[in-house]
Swiss-Prot record:
One of its GO terms (biological process) is proton motive force-driven plasma membrane ATP synthesis. GO terms for molecular function: ATP binding; proton-transporting ATP synthase activity, rotational mechanism; proton-transporting ATPase activity, rotational mechanism. Produces ATP from ADP in the presence of a proton gradient across the membrane. The gene is atpE. This is V-type ATP synthase subunit E. Belongs to the V-ATPase E subunit family. The lineage of its organism: Bacteria, Pseudomonadati, Chlamydiota, Chlamydiia, Chlamydiales. Transmembrane segments: none annotated. Keywords: ATP synthesis, Hydrogen ion transport, Ion transport, Transport. Gene3D superfamilies: 1.20.5.2950. GO terms for cellular component: proton-transporting two-sector ATPase complex, catalytic domain. It comes from Chlamydia felis (strain Fe/C-56) (Chlamydophila felis). Pfam families: HrpE. InterPro entries: ATPase_V1_Esu (IPR002842), T3SS_HrpE/ATPase_suE (IPR009335).
Amino acid sequence: MADLGAEDKLKQICDALRIETLKPAEDEADAIVRNAKEQAKRIIDEAQERAAQIIASAKEEADFKLRQGESALAQAGKRSLESLKQAVENKVFKESLAEWLDNALADPEVSAKLVAALIQAIEDKGISGDLTAYIGKHVATRTVNEFLGKTILAKLRGKGVAVGSFVGGVQLKVEDKNWVLDLSSDTLLDLLMRYLQKDFREMIFQGS
């Protein structure tokens, strides 16, 4: 039961830290959406024109078919419009967000701050163990170590950070418990997509 309690604490730490990483992202969200909206305008215009044609054609067919009790074509038009919206969302919004996130996480100081925050968080929860900190594979370990300083480095296995298999962000592993606190770029992108997706849809597709 003690291990279960510790695992619950670990989950709470991960959730709390991930929420903290969303705060600066919220400040960036408006700029991301504005940029995405500019990039998406041409695609959206074409998509809406195409969707309108599909729906108009479907409705014409449906007027006839409905007399026979069939409405499948009208529904197909609506599904086509939704598919086009999703294509724009994935192409423009996700790519813009991923680019911003990659740029932010490429900064060695950001990686150092994330590592320090994770270590401080587990210490505050009374969790201890042999720690390994992994950073993105394109971030310089020496620079991150310099930002961390001797006090924090002394708490890490090998007295420094290691290179992970992910692009950006960090992971902290409690070796003896085989726990991993994951703030890697893929994890953060997934969280940000879910956090900002509704606002993006409302702004881009308003009235469509």
